Amino acid sequence: MPLKKIPHAFKEICDRVAAATFCNPFDPTRRELYSKLIGRQYDDSDKSDFHALSEAVEKARVSLGNAGILDYRKFRAIDAEKIRMLILFGCYHQIFYLMDEHIESQLKSPGKTIPFRHGGGCVSTLCRNGFSEEESVWYVGVFYQIRRAYYFISRNLIGSSPCMHAFKRRLWNNLFTHDIGNYETCMWDRMEEFSVLLVGETGSGKGSAASALGYSGFVPYDLVKKCFAFDFQDAFVAANLSQYSQSLLESELFGHRKGAFTGALSDYDGLFARCRAFGSVFLDEIGDVPLTAQIKLLRLLQEREYSPVGGRQILGFCGRVIAAANPSIDQHLNDGEFRHDFYYRLCSDRIELPTLRQRISELPSELEAMVQYLIRKITGISDQGLKGMVMEVLSTLKGHDWPGNVRELEQSIRQILMSQHYTPWKEPDDSIDKVDEFARKIKNGSLTASELASGYARHLYDLNGNYESVSKIMNVDRRTVKKYLNRS
């Protein structure tokens, strides 16, 4: 029997669906394609547009099929892929909102695996239309990943300025690559080899971006148990590396064996041991990691293996590394405080976070949108009166460039809700010669040991301009230098 062709009347819709099926949802191209499919401007937030899109695709599928069956294998090669995309597109949109409900149920039940019985129906639909059972089960997992990626990127990262749209597109590509066809054929089970570095100012949202990535990894579907293999929340483990002393840092990362050091009374599984297959480890403040730990992390990234502190056993690491740093990491590279080989291995992808001032300069209404979102986050309600009051106070801050970014904005809202005013932090007046003041306090004997060390560290840093020099002169590690400087 000769292979079929797509009838001319359906060629255009099949071409558009094929182009839109796995298109980055944060790329304007997708909205343009969806708009053409429904014959009007498509709005993601309008359910009537969603239903119109689903109906248009379903109508084409039914018309092209036979008694509800549309086997893509019966079409000639040039058309078979388009029919395959039409089937996948329709199946995904059938369980679109069901997956959103499942995500929200799973968020309320951390550590538990919530059943998703609709996956079986999706598998049956795909199998009837030419897909193998193995393929069909895999696609349920991909649909779930796509839905979580959109859910968490769009909800964790509020904003519609051009720079935020570009940032969200980069995050999406970091999960599925710029071509999801490559992801499907050869990369979906190798993404752990592609680490990512998020670079942004304090308070710009690195943690939110990392959790959006971490919650959006692939999770296989179990057809027998009618549930996904694990809770996506269990696949993301995180640590702020700046909170650990140098002596404890490696233990927290790699774990330790009983007796490895004073106080190691039992074996301890570190961060990497707690990361499961398809999971992610988030290393915040990676720029603060001492050189000795950088060498061990480099080995982990290159060889996918490590050893616990005090142990000889070699353990495998099966997850993905998401790291975050301030823009000062570039200076650390120049100063020799951050290894270049480690940096290159860490940066399969480097994504810059936009600052709040950049976002507002591109789209002034973004400030109001952020205020509305943060008020709801803080109070649990969307109150126009509260928003109006907060915006009125913020309007008095002419020229304020929000150095603390979203975190500062959130705290300003808290202060306004409490006192109806906000006073931004200002850098203290440096008119007094700090060196003379420090010397006077030494002469008067008015400094504590901590103040003496902090003042001296600050003086050395002002002279040399980097942590490494201060560390060598004071004969302390870089982490201690940072602690002194934070106190000064």
Predicted features by range, described:
Residues 1-85, 99, 105, 411, ...:
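Bacterial C-terminal helix-turn-helix
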Residues 162, 292-295, 310-320, 328-435:
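Nucleotide-binding/hydrolysis machinery
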Residues 96-158, 166:
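Interdomain "pre-motor" coupling segment immediately N-terminal to P-loop NTPase/helicase cores
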Residues 151-194:
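Pre-Walker A (pre-P-loop) alpha-helix and adjacent loop at the N terminus of AAA/AAA+ ATPase modules
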Residues 207-319, 330-347, 360-362:
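Conserved AAA+ P-loop NTPase core
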Residues 171, 198, 204, 239, ...:
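Conserved RecA-like P-loop NTPase ATPase core
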Residues 189-209:
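Walker A/P-loop nucleotide-binding motif
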Residues 181-193, 223-229, 269, 311, ...:
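Short helix/loop segment immediately N-terminal to the Walker
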